[in-house]
Amino acid sequence: MMNRVVLVGRLTKDPELRYTPAGVAVATFTLAVNRPFKNGQGEQEADFIQCVVWRKPAENVANFLKKGSLAGVDGRVQTRNYEGNDGKRVYVTEIVAESVQFLESKQNGAGGSTSNNNQSETNYSNDNKTSSYRADRSQNGDSFANEGAPVDINPDDLPF
């Protein structure tokens, strides 16, 4: 059996950091994740997904992410229940994050950075040397930016 979730979205409000009686940090936040299609009116819809993260990553989330920050979450789905104030059973489904990636740099105003946000250049090439991939990290961290230059793709290299 497998219970694995990977999400990318924006925080709907600042994370809430609390500590258990044993002193363990826990942060909760809601991630707005766009659906991959538009509705009948041509509008992009989003799902609002509750997330929880524990220990040191919880403190990092609280310190570096804020409302509107772009984040990637890798974790699992968990359903729990409790008795509400009115005596009715309340069910909560949330994502327990095993890791949270900060997908924007501080320069973009998001308040966080990725763990691999160096200003380096990486070159990759395949065995037959017919094509190569060059990723240049620009100042804004967009590794896909090419300053409007045409992309050189050999049709023989496409899988379709």
UniProtKB/Swiss-Prot annotation:
Assembly and partners? Answer: Homotetramer.
Entry-linked NCBIfam families: ssb
GO MF terms listed in the record are: single-stranded DNA binding
SUPFAM superfamilies recorded:
Nucleic acid-binding proteins
Q: What's one GO BP annotation on this UniProt entry? A: DNA replication
Q: Which gene encodes it?
A: ssb3
Residue ranges constituting the SSB domain according to the UniProt record:
2-104
UniProt protein name:
Single-stranded DNA-binding protein 3
